[in-house]
């Protein structure tokens, strides 16, 4: 889902939820908590795949345009991580405009308490803050990937001003019934070799 132009704001946001503390990235000690949240969301049909500890380590080892110390916000209750949000961005080559990618993940039983809304507000505000440094902040956009099965998050995003711009579908084809049609004359199938990579990509 995508929202319109990113607008800078000097209005500070106050994050307050009874029993919840908000903090920034503490290091690799945060990874198990993130995995637990993502696993709970996967089990509830709110995540596309089950992420492992190694997945999270690899993700953080290859971050681009993201400083975990300032671009992640974590929520804790009774010393346990219950949610987090992040902001990363990419710059389009032709226009130099930035697209900010926002994520918000909370335990499903924390959604009705408003935690995800608070984290989304922070992510949007933080994207605007970073956008003020871009070449054309008035053209920057925010992007958020979610699943249609997560109707709570879809409704929250729409309430915040996001609207769908594209859909992805996972489809399966029965390989036993594929037609055995001959290739057109002059066309042949060849294996891909390393020397072909540049031309293909």
Where is each model-derived feature located?
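Acyl-donor-binding surface of acyltransferase catalytic domains
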Residues: 1-14, 89-187, 193
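Anionic, Ser/Thr-rich low-complexity intrinsically disordered regions
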Residues: 16-17, 43
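A short beta-loop-alpha structural element at the N-terminal edge
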Residues: 21-34, 188-201
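Conserved donor-binding loop and adjoining core beta-sheet/short helix segment
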Residues: 23-28, 39-133, 143
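Short, solvent-exposed polar/charged micro-motifs at secondary-structure junctions
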Residues: 32-34, 57-59, 152-154, 199
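Residues within well-ordered alpha-helical secondary structure of globular protein domains
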Residues: 37-40, 159
């Amino acid at each position: 889902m995508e929202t319109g132009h990113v607008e800078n704001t000097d209005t500070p946001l106050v994050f307050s939820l009874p029993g919840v503390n908000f903090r920034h990235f503490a290091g690799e000690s945060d990874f198990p908590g993130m995995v637990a949240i993502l696993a709970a969301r996967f089990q509830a049909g709110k995540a596309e795949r089950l992420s492992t500890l190694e997945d999270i380590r690899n993700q953080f080892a290859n971050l681009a345009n993201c400083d975990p110390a300032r671009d992640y916000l974590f929520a804790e209750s009774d010393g346990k991580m219950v949610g987090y949000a992040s902001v990363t961005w990419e710059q389009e080559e032709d226009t130099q405009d930035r697209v900010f990618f926002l994520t918000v993940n909370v335990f499903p039983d924390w959604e009705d308490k408003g935690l995800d809304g608070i984290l989304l507000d922070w992510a949007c505000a933080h994207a605007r803050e970073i956008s003020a440094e871009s070449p054309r902040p008035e053209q920057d956009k925010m992007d958020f990937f979610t699943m249609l099965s997560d109707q709570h998050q879809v409704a929250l995003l729409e309430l915040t001003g996001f609207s769908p711009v594209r859909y992805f579908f996972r489809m399966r084809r029965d390989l036993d019934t594929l037609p055995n049609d001959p290739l057109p004359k002059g066309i042949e199938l060849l294996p891909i070799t390393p020397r072909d990579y540049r031309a293909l990509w």
